[in-house]
């Protein structure tokens, strides 16, 4: 008896049951002819993708003569075929789009099928597939048998095409948002480096229209006030940490557990809009990180942090200034080479507040710069949120539109 099923979510005009089958009944596993190392070079005419460069940038090439010979004599993917990684991170996929390329035998394979399955449907089936004989094991290889014995439940070819088309549209939308996000993030990095003066200069390389004149040098102590209030009355029990992406964030939200001591009455109490300097250095943060609390009304931080609030400077300007690396030179001069203790820079509050920074003389320009970067952050955040929403939608639809 044929096992007939239907998914939870379905296009209205389809009503037939789905049929259970195996990939091996639909086709065979194909692969390119083996290429030996001595047949490749670091530069050449046709890219040769190994498992380590699959889906990325090639680092090996073969001659056009070899490519044309092997393409004509041995199996080669058709446009639309879904290539699969059979070793390492098994099951990664790349849709072959007709480009001139050759792929490492046995490590990169595809299902050469008879047309009873739509490639766009197959591509997204691979996103949720449980390979036969692999699940729950430590096997890091996908053998032909694993692929061919894997069960699949199929609707009609027209319904497969409709489902595949929907997910391809979602993928295109996700790719568009991710490209835009990368562009906005790159723009921010560039503008952070160019909209604040370089060391020894008093005018930035790029300046907003309508402003002129030299910027002025200030010491941090002249434009801010140190915050040393303790959490004596347990106003807050939200222990914070500094994250590159999220700034000051709840430890439990970030680490999925609380790192701080159970008794946080001796911690500093930081309020929304105030800044914290974490002297702990790490990859990408050679001199620690300075972030403003924006996410919550208050929180607590270890007394190893240095806290302050903006007084005679626009707070948004200061927040984005400390996202750049323009303050690194001053702090590095205070923290002498080798003066590091258990992952912390050995810099005193007095030295920290004596660091110099250059700011626009006019408050209006400070605000304009702060507003520029805040708007850019809003664009970045909205794209990140949209990507998360689309990824969650795709995950849900994959669960409910396949069997």
What annotation goes with each model-predicted range?
Residues 1-15, 176-213, 385-403:
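Short amphipathic coiled-coil heptad-repeat segments
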Residues 3-7, 102-108, 136-161, 298-304, ...:
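A short glycine-rich beta-alpha junction/loop motif
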Residues 7, 161-173, 180, 216-218, ...:
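Extracellular/lumenal glycan-associated surfaces
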Residues 9-33, 207-231:
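Non-catalytic DNA-recognition/assembly elements of restriction-modification systems
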Residues 11, 18-22, 156, 167-174, ...:
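Long, compositionally biased tandem-repeat segments
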Residues 24-27, 37-68, 228-260:
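DNA target-recognition patches
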Residues 35, 71, 136, 151, ...:
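Short, solvent-exposed loop/turn positions at domain surfaces
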Residues 50-51, 61-127, 143, 265-327, ...:
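A short beta-sheet element
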């Amino acid at each position: 008896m044929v096992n007939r099923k239907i998914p939870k979510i379905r296009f209205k005009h389809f009503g037939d049951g789905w049929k259970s089958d195996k990939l091996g009944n639909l086709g065979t596993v194909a692969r390119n002819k083996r290429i030996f190392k001595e047949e490749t070079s670091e530069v050449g005419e046709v890219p040769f993708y190994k498992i380590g460069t699959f889906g990325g940038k090639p680092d090996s090439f073969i001659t056009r003569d070899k490519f044309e010979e092997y393409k004509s004599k041995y199996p080669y993917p058709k446009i639309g075929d879904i290539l699969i990684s059979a070793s390492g991170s098994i099951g990664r996929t790349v849709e072959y789009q007709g480009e001139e390329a050759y792929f490492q035998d046995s490590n990169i394979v595809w299902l050469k099928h008879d047309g009873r399955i739509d490639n766009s449907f197959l591509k997204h089936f691979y996103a949720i597939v449980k390979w036969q004989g692999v699940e729950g094991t430590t096997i890091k290889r996908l053998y032909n048998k694993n692929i061919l014995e894997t069960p699949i439940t199929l609707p009609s070819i027209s319904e497969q095409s409709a489902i595949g088309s929907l997910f391809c549209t979602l993928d295109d939308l996700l790719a568009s948002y991710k490209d835009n996000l990368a562009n906005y993030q790159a723009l921010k990095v560039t503008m952070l480096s160019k909209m604040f003066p370089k060391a020894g200069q008093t005018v930035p390389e790029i300046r907003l229209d309508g402003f002129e004149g030299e910027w002025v040098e200030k010491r941090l102590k002249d434009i801010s006030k140190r915050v040393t209030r303790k959490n004596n009355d347990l106003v807050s029990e939200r222990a914070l940490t500094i994250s590159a992406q999220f700034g000051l964030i709840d430890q439990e939200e970030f680490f999925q557990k609380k790192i701080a001591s159970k008794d946080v009455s001796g911690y500093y109490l930081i309020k929304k809009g105030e800044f914290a300097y974490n002297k702990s250095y790490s990859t990408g943060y050679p001199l620690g990180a300075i972030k403003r609390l924006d996410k919550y009304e208050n929180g607590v931080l270890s007394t190893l942090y240095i806290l302050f609030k903006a007084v005679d400077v626009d707070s948004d300007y200061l927040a984005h200034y400390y996202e750049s690396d323009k303050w690194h030179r001053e702090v590095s001069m205070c923290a002498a080479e080798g003066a590091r203790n258990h992952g912390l820079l050995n810099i005193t509050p007095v030295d920290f507040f004596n660091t110099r920074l250059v700011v626009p003389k006019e408050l209006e320009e400070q605000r304009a710069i702060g507003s520029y970067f805040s708007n850019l952050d809003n664009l970045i955040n909205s794209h990140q949120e949209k990507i998360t929403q689309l990824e969650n939608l795709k995950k849900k639809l994959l669960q409910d539109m396949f069997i």
